[in-house]
Amino acid sequence: MKDNYHHGDLRNALIEAGIKIINESGEDALSLRKVAAACGVSHAAPYAHFPDKESLLSAIKETVTNDFLSELEKAANGSKVKNAQDAIMTMGERYILFFRNNPDYFNFLFHKQKPEVHTDMSKDYPNDYAPFLMFKRYLNKYFEESGIKLSAKEKEIGLIKTWGLVQGLSSIAGMENVNATISWKVLAKECLK
């Protein structure tokens, strides 16, 4: 049988294959047999990691979310970050580059899984998507640090404008047919100024 994965990392190979299948053919097309075939392993091999399709889907969502959140945390805690504004800028850049480097993740998360978010800046919601909640908290911190008095409505609009810019740039960055002459690292930094 053809070996399409790195030995010892079948679980992650199955997750990546699952994301590709979902993005190409939809969630209904996902099966443990199909991810096994995509990885070039026996049909029984995925069962060592996932008892059923639902557990694979759950692992896909968890993996993508954790990878994304980890990137944002690294950005927010970077050595050049001195305040909330710096954190937001570096998180925004990392957000865009993460999805530029992982376009299948963007489609999976925002078009297939549809994570829950609340744009009310006055409180956290327990079901909010963790990376979004982190972004929202830093934006709230920025509003506090800036000393600018904003109404709840103005804060919510600020969140939507900021998130919309980053989300839109991430969507464009992940498109195969977009051929920018400037690197996305530079574009992300310049567009977020």
What residue spans do the PLM features occupy?
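Amphipathic alpha-helical packing segments from all-alpha helical-bundle domains
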Residues: 73, 86, 119-146, 156-160, ...
